[in-house]
UniProtKB/Swiss-Prot annotation:
Name of the protein described by the UniProt record: Interferon-inducible GTPase 5
UniProt modified residues of type Phosphoserine: 247, 304
Phylogenetic placement of the source organism: Eukaryota, Metazoa, Chordata, Craniata, Vertebrata
Residue ranges occupied by any IRG-type G domain in the UniProt entry: 53-235
EC identifiers of the protein: 3.6.5.-
First-level EC class: hydrolase
Annotated catalysed reactions: GTP + H2O = GDP + phosphate + H(+)
Organism: Bos taurus (Bovine)
Cited function: Required for sperm motility and therefore male fertility, via positive regulation of spermatozoa fibrous sheath formation.
Length: 465
C-alpha cells in the first residue's frame, strides 16, 4: 500500500492518503498523458473494482466442528436469522453452500461438507468441494488438531494459499475442566495447553507459522474471536482487503477505525473522479454524474458503518434494546436518508474549504496539478465526503456505546479510573464513603468507548481552532 503525505495547510496536520501502488501508478500515467477522458475512465474503473472485489473463503473441517455456527458469527447472524447457515447436532452440510454477507454479497463464506467421513478419501473430498476455487481457508476443529486437520492443512499449503486454524467450542472445554478439577482450575492455563498442542501438531504437518485462534461461536466477543477478525483483515492481499474488511462485524473500536481508514481511500478516488468529470467539455454531464456518484458513496458509508435500519434492528435485538434507542444517538444529517436535496445542501456547505484542499493536493502530489488547477469540484467533494465520513464514524461509535450501556435506573454514578486495570468501579454510598464493586464487561466497554470518543472530539475541536 503506497502512501502520499499532503503538506500541512494553515496549521492543519498532514494528511496520509492510502492507495495501492499499482493504483497510484495507473493514475500517474493517465494524468501525465494529458488524456483527461482516459483519466476519468481509469478512475471509474478503480472505484468499480473496489465495489465488486470478490472474496471466496472456504470453511472446512470435520463434521460437527461448528463450521456453520462460525460462519453465522462471522456474518453477525444468529442461528434463527433468515439467511443464517443451517446448524444442528448432526451433519447438515452435504455439498458446498455459499453464504454471502448480508450487506456485502461480494464476500462469500463457503460452508464445506465435513471432511474425514467414512468411505470418503482425502483426494475424493478435495475434488468434491473443489478445493482450489477458494482464496482463503478457515480450518475448523472442535478438538485438538488431528489427522483430518493436518491433511487439510498440507493440501492448503500445497496450493500456495493461507489458512487460519480455528479451534471452536473452547467454552465447553473450559466448563468440563472446571467441573473435573475445580480446585486447580485456571482458564488461562487450559487455553494455553490447547493452543500449544494445536501449534505443535500443525508444525509437524509442515506449517511454518501456524495461526491458531480459540473461539466460542456462541460468544463472538470473547477469547480469540476479535483477534481472528483483525488478523484476517490485515493479512489479506491489497486487492482483497477492501471486501474483506467491509464484511467484518464491528464488535470493537479497532474494527470501526480500520473500516474508516479503508473508506478514506474511497473519498480521494471519488473526489478525483468528480474533478475529472468537471473538466470534460460535455454540457450537463458533471451535475448529473456528481449527484449519482455522491449519493452512491454516501449510502455506501451509511451501510458500511451499520447505520441503516436493518443493521440497527439486528444490533438492538442482540443487546436487548429498542432500535429507536440506538437511532436516537445518531447526529449525522444523513441518518434518515441520503437524498439529492441533502447532498446539495452538504455540497454547498463544503465549498468554503475547497480551494485550500485543492492547493494542498496540488502541492503534495504535483502530477494531479492538471486536475486540481481549478479545484472547486475536487476540493468541495473531498471536503464534503471527508466530513460525512467522520460524522458517520462517530455515529457508529455512539451507537455501540449506547448498545453497551446498562439501564440508567440501575446504575449509580460511576467513574472509570484511568490508571487502574483492576476492573472496579467506584460507587457513592453515603457521605464520602466509597465502595468497590466489580465493573461489568458491558459497562467497562461502554465507559471506555465513551472516553475515547470524548478524547477524539476534544482533538477535533483543537484542530478546528
Amino acid at each position: 500500500m503506497a502512501t502520499s503525505k499532503l503538506p500541512a495547510v494553515s496549521g492543519e496536520e498532514e494528511t496520509t492518503i492510502l492507495m495501492a501502488k499499482e493504483e497510484l501508478e495507473a493514475l500517474r500515467t493517465a494524468f501525465e498523458s494529458g488524456d483527461i477522458p482516459q483519466a476519468a475512465s481509469r478512475l471509474r474503473e478503480l472505484l468499480a473494482s473496489s465495489d465488486c472485489t470478490r472474496l471466496e473463503v472456504g470453511v472446512t473441517g470435520e463434521s460437527g466442528a461448528g463450521k456453520s455456527s462460525l460462519i453465522n458469527a462471522l456474518r453477525g447472524l444468529g442461528a434463527e436469522d433468515p439467511d443464517a447457515a443451517l446448524t444442528g447436532v448432526v451433519e447438515t452440510t452435504i455439498e458446498p453452500s455459499p453464504y454471502p454477507h448480508p450487506q456485502f454479497p461480494d464476500v462469500t463464506l463457503w460452508d464445506l461438507p465435513g471432511a474425514g467421513s467414512p468411505g470418503c478419501s482425502a483426494d475424493k473430498y478435495l475434488k468434491q468441494v473443489d478445493f482450489g476455487r477458494y482464496d482463503f481457508f478457515l480450518l475448523v476443529s472442535p478438538r485438538r488438531c488431528g489427522a483430518v486437520e493436518t491433511r487439510l492443512a498440507s493440501e492448503i499449503l500445497r496450493q500456495g494459499k493461507k489458512f487460519y486454524f480455528v479451534r471452536t467450542k473452547v467454552d465447553e472445554d473450559l466448563a468440563a475442566t472446571r467441573m473435573q478439577r475445580p480446585s486447580g482450575f485456571s482458564e488461562g492455563a487450559v487455553l494455553h495447553e490447547i493452543r500449544e498442542h494445536c501449534v505443535e501438531r500443525l508444525r509437524g504437518a509442515g506449517v511454518h507459522d501456524p495461526r491458531v485462534f480459540l473461539v466460542s461461536n456462541l460468544s463472538p466477543a470473547r477469547y480469540d474471536f476479535p483477534l481472528l477478525m483483525s488478523t484476517w483483515e490485515r493479512d489479506l492481499p491489497a486487492h482483497r482487503r477492501h471486501a474483506g474488511l467491509l464484511s467484518l462485524p464491528d464488535i470493537s473500536l479497532e474494527a470501526l477505525q480500520e473500516k474508516k481508514d479503508m473508506l478514506q481511500e474511497q473519498v480521494l478516488k471519488t473526489a478525483l473522479v468528480s474533478g475529472v468529470i468537471q473538466a470534460l467539455p460535455v454540457p450537463g454531464l458533471a451535475a448529473a454524474y456528481d449527484d449519482a456518484l455522491l449519493i452512491r458513496s454516501l449510502r455506501g458509508y451509511h451501510r458500511s458503518f451499520g447505520l441503516d435500519d436493518d443493521s440497527l434492528a439486528k444490533l438492538a435485538e442482540q443487546v436487548g434494546k429498542q432500535a429507536g434507542d440506538l437511532r436516537s444517538v445518531i447526529r449525522s444529517p444523513l441518518a434518515n436518508e441520503v437524498s439529492p436535496e441533502t447532498v446539495l445542501r452538504l455540497y454547498s456547505q463544503s465549498s468554503d474549504g475547497a480551494m485550500r484542499v485543492a492547493r494542498a493536493f496540488e502541492k503534495g502530489i504535483p502530477v494531479f496539478g492538471t486536475l486540481v488547477a481549478g479545484g472547486i469540484s475536487f476540493g468541495t467533494v473531498y471536503t464534503m465526503l471527508q466530513g460525512c465520513l467522520n460524522e458517520m464514524a462517530e455515529d457508529a461509535q455512539r451507537v455501540r456505546i449506547k448498545a453497551l450501556e446498562e439501564e440508567e435506573d440501575t446504575q449509580p454514578d460511576v467513574s472509570l479510573e484511568a490508571a487502574g486495570d483492576n476492573g472496579v468501579e467506584k460507587r457513592g454510598s453515603g457521605e464520602g464513603s466509597m465502595e468497590e464493586a466489580p465493573l461489568s464487561t458491558r459497562r467497562k466497554l461502554g465507559l471506555l468507548l465513551k472516553y475515547i470518543l470524548d478524547s477524539w472530539k476534544k482533538r477535533d475541536l483543537a484542530e478546528d481552532k
